[in-house]
C-alpha cells in the first residue's frame, strides 16, 4: 500500500503545472492560450520570457529530481522482485513524467516530458545528464529546433544506458523516448514541412 501511495504522490508532484501557475500569477496569462499552447518550459520561454522560462524549467526539472529519492523517504520494504522494481527511483520518476505529460490538474493535457525527464536522469546519473545536455545544446546550435534537439538527446539516453549497462535505465529511457517522440509528433511533421519555428537566441 505504501508503494502505491508513493507512486501516486510522484504522479501528483509531476502534475504540478509550473508554467500555467507562473503565467497566471505573475503575468495574468494562461500559456495554454498562447504560442504552441503547451504547458512546458519551451512555451513558457516563448510566451512569458526568459526569466520566467528559466524558473519553469527549474521547477519542471526539480519535479523529476525530487521523486527519485522518494524510496529513501517513504517506509517502503520490497518483498519481492515486483515490489523491488517499483521502488527503484527511476521507476518512481516515470510516474512523475507521466504526471507532467498527463496532469490531473489540467484535464490530462500537459507538457512534453523533456525537463522533468532531465530531472529524473539528474537524480540517478548526473554525468550522463551532462553528456545529454551537451548533445542537446550542440544539436540546438546546429538546427535551432528545440523539439529535434530533445528527441536526439532522448535517443542518445537510450544509447548511453546500453553503454553503461544500466538495464532499468534502458527500459525507462526507451519508454521516455517513445513518449517524447509521440508528444513531439506534430513538431516532427512541421520540421519536414519547414514550418517548425526556430529559436533566435543561439
Curated annotation (Swiss-Prot):
Pathway membership of this protein?
Lipid metabolism; phospholipid metabolism
- Gene Ontology CC entries for this record: plasma membrane
Q: Which keywords does this chain's UniProt record carry?
A: Cell membrane, Lipid biosynthesis, Lipid metabolism, Membrane, Phospholipid biosynthesis, Phospholipid metabolism, Transferase, Transmembrane, Transmembrane helix
Organism superkingdom: Bacteria
Query: Which EC number(s) does UniProt give?
Result: 2.3.1.275
Q: Name one GO biological process term.
A: phospholipid biosynthetic process
* Subcellular location as annotated: Cell membrane
Primary localization class, coarse:
membrane
Q: List the SMART domains hit by this protein, alphabetically.
A: G3P_acyltransf (SM01207)
Provide the reaction this enzyme catalyses: an acyl phosphate + sn-glycerol 3-phosphate = a 1-acyl-sn-glycero-3-phosphate + phosphate
Q: Which InterPro entries match?
A: G3P_acylTferase_PlsY (IPR003811)
Which residue spans traverse the membrane? 2-22, 54-74, 85-105, 118-138, 140-160, 162-182
Q: How does it sit in the membrane?
A: Multi-pass membrane protein
* Its biological purpose: Catalyzes the transfer of an acyl group from acyl-phosphate (acyl-PO(4)) to glycerol-3-phosphate (G3P) to form lysophosphatidic acid (LPA). This enzyme utilizes acyl-phosphate as fatty acyl donor, but not acyl-CoA or acyl-ACP.
The similarity comment for this entry is:
Belongs to the PlsY family.
For this protein, the record's PANTHER family field holds: GLYCEROL-3-PHOSPHATE ACYLTRANSFERASE-RELATED, INNER MEMBRANE PROTEIN YGIH
**Protein's name in the database:** Glycerol-3-phosphate acyltransferase
GN (gene name) = plsY
Amino acid at each position: 500500500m505504501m508503494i502505491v501511495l508513493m507512486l501516486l504522490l510522484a504522479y501528483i508532484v509531476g502534475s504540478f503545472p509550473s508554467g500555467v501557475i507562473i503565467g497566471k500569477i505573475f503575468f495574468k496569462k494562461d500559456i495554454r492560450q498562447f504560442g504552441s499552447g503547451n504547458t512546458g518550459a519551451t512555451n513558457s520561454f516563448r510566451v512569458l520570457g526568459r526569466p520566467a522560462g528559466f524558473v519553469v524549467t527549474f521547477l519542471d526539472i526539480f519535479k523529476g529530481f525530487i521523486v527519485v529519492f522518494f524510496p529513501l523517504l517513504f517506509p517502503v520494504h520490497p518483498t519481492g522482485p515486483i515490489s523491488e522494481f517499483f521502488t527503484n527511483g527511476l521507476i518512481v520518476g516515470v510516474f512523475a513524467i507521466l504526471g507532467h505529460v498527463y496532469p490531473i490538474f489540467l484535464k490530462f493535457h500537459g507538457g512534453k516530458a523533456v525537463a522533468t525527464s532531465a530531472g529524473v536522469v539528474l537524480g540517478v546519473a548526473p554525468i550522463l545528464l551532462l553528456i545529454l545536455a551537451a548533445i542537446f545544446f550542440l544539436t540546438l546550435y546546429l538546427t535551432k529546433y528545440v523539439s529535434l534537439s530533445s528527441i536526439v538527446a532522448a535517443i542518445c539516453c537510450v544509447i548511453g544506458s546500453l553503454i553503461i549497462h544500466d538495464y532499468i535505465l534502458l527500459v525507462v529511457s526507451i519508454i521516455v523516448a517513445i513518449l517524447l517522440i509521440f508528444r513531439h509528433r506534430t513538431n516532427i511533421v512541421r520540421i519536414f514541412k519547414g514550418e517548425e519555428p526556430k529559436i533566435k537566441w543561439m
